[in-house]
């Protein structure tokens, strides 16, 4: 609305100046001042509207990820860790723009939740770099990254990805529902949860990682 008002004011100022026909050859000073002032105000409105649009961009539209909603968990994990993963992943998928996620520890997928696909996890160069540097890598717009094929274990139309290392052995890979959807506060929360998980994961015996990755109902039956 501000942009429309600025454009309308500028157009009216130009029309007024073009159609004004003074009785004498000289343009009255009052008219000149009014024209300059109205033109300046119209330009100011245009600038305000542009700055406002940049400071408050429209929220990107939510992408419907291609896959099936699901939850898969390694059956042999301790109950305390299962509860932590259930609570944390639920909060992640409801309180942030996350739509899909994987937890990997020691090259083994322990948890998949959200929109799932059938492709197996593969430790690619971006994930490896996050582990080596122990830094979060946020891919804000997957369409711009030539290495996006590394994440074929996520839905193919995932717009944004956060790679969060968990020590040198683990990683959280989280897919969001639109480009640039993860805020800094989202990333801080993810980092905090990763630190909490690392403490528990480093204490796991090897036997706890040997169970099948399956929906909780199937795991309970087996």
Residue ranges and their predicted role:
Residues 1-58:
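Alpha-helical transmembrane segments and their helix-membrane boundary motifs
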Residues 52-83:
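Membrane-proximal helical linkers
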Residues 80-84, 88, 122, 185-189, ...:
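Short amphipathic alpha-helical segments
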Residues 89-93, 97-114:
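Short, hydrophobic-rich beta-strand element in sensory/regulatory alpha-beta domains
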Residues 106-162:
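Regulatory sensory and allosteric helical modules in signal-transduction proteins
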Residues 164-173:
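Short hydrophobic/glycine-rich mini-motifs in sensory/regulatory modules
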Residues 172-222:
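Juxtadomain coupling helices with adjacent low-complexity linkers
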């Amino acid at each position: 609305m501000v942009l429309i008002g600025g454009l309308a004011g500028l157009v009216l100022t130009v029309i007024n100046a073009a159609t004004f026909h003074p009785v004498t050859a000289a343009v009255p000073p009052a008219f000149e001042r009014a024209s300059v002032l109205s033109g300046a105000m119209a330009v100011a409105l245009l600038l305000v509207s542009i700055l406002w649009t940049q400071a408050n961009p429209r929220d990107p539209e939510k992408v419907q990820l291609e896959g099936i909603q699901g939850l898969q968990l390694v059956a042999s994990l301790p109950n305390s860790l299962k509860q932590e993963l259930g609570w944390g992943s639920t909060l992640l998928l409801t309180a942030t723009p996350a739509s899909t996620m994987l937890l990997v520890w020691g090259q083994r997928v322990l948890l998949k939740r959200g929109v799932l696909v059938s492709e197996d996890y593969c430790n690619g160069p971006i994930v490896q770099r996050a582990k080596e540097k122990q830094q979060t890598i946020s891919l804000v717009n997957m369409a711009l990254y030539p290495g996006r094929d590394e994440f074929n274990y996520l839905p193919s139309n995932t717009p944004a990805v956060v790679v969060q290392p968990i020590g040198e052995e683990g990683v959280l890979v989280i897919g969001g529902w639109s480009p640039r959807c993860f805020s800094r506060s989202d990333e801080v929360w993810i980092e905090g949860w990763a630190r909490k998980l690392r403490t528990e994961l480093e204490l796991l015996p090897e036997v706890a990682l040997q169970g099948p990755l399956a929906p909780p109902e199937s795991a309970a039956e087996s």
